[in-house]
């Protein structure tokens, strides 16, 4: 039995989202993320080319007023224009393009941007830059054969404007689950990459999912028996997510309510954190 526990707790004076994966009453994995997220990694924007630096083969693209990112010119042919220009046209200052943040700003470096938009699901990844069909190298020969057969019609479509990568997780899924997720990712692509062409400059077209949704996405549904949270906002988001992506899983979500015993205390998350902090690794040198 695998239970997913999603809650909010204080850590070092900061409010955090905490996700615990519990098996047979024991926390096996704990993921934390600041509730006030600073990262923009994975976000997709309508950016505007500020200038082009041919000497370093890069363009500097504004994704918000005063916020610029580094865009490699070798991806210029993959650009989806929001300014009405035809695909494959030369990139010019002032052009409005769809970009995804591939690396956060760090140590004085600008955030890195890419034209290859990625939409990641539990079993599949849909991409706009590489319009090929691929499978994870970790899949066995028989798994690759089965999954290729299930997605043969989609892979053979000559008119598709995106690529598809089959993740290792897909080996655990039924055909209906794979096709249901494909439908969801295609609708997300349509909403962001197609409809985004008509959005105004600096629009945020897609925001990376918080840790509690990515954790939920990555857990195999066949092993997951219970999803519990005591945070109303998290509960609303996970039920909406399940309704859209896996309606058959929605009944597993439940809301815990006890003001005297918060969920993080009931599930002993503080103890799990203490255990992690106490762990020591003994080196050969004795340090």
Residue ranges, per PLM feature:
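DE-rich acidic low-complexity regions and acidic surface loops
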Residues: 1-287
């Amino acid at each position: 039995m695998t239970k997913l526990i999603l809650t909010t707790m204080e850590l070092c004076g900061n409010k955090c989202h905490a996700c615990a994966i519990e098996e047979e009453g024991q926390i096996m994995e704990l993921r934390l993320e600041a509730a006030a997220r600073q990262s923009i990694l994975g976000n997709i924007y309508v950016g505007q080319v500020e200038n082009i630096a041919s000497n370093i083969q890069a363009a500097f693209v504004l994704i918000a007023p005063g916020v610029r990112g580094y865009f490699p010119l070798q991806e210029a042919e993959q650009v989806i224009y929001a300014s009405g220009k035809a695909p494959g046209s030369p990139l010019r200052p002032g052009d409005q393009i769809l970009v995804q943040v591939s690396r956060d700003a760090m140590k004085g470096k600008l955030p890195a941007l890419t034209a290859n938009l990625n939409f990641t699901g539990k079993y599949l990844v849909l991409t706009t830059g590489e319009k090929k069909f691929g499978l994870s190298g970790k899949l066995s020969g028989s798994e690759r054969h089965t999954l290729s057969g299930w997605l043969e019609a989609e892979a053979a479509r000559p008119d598709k404007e995106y690529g598809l990568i089959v993740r290792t997780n897909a080996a655990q899924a039924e055909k209906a689950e794979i096709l249901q997720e494909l439908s969801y990712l295609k609708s997300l692509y349509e909403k962001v990459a197609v409809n985004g062409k008509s959005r105004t400059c600096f629009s945020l077209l897609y925001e990376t999912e918080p840790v509690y949704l990515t954790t939920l996405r990555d857990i195999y549904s066949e092993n997951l028996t219970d999803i519990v949270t005591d945070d109303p906002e998290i509960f609303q988001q996970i039920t909406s997510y399940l309704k859209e992506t896996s309606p058959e899983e929605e009944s597993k979500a439940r809301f815990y309510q006890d003001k005297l015993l918060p969920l993080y205390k009931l599930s002993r998350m503080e103890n799990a954190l203490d255990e992690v902090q106490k762990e020591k690794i003994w080196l050969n040198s004795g340090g």
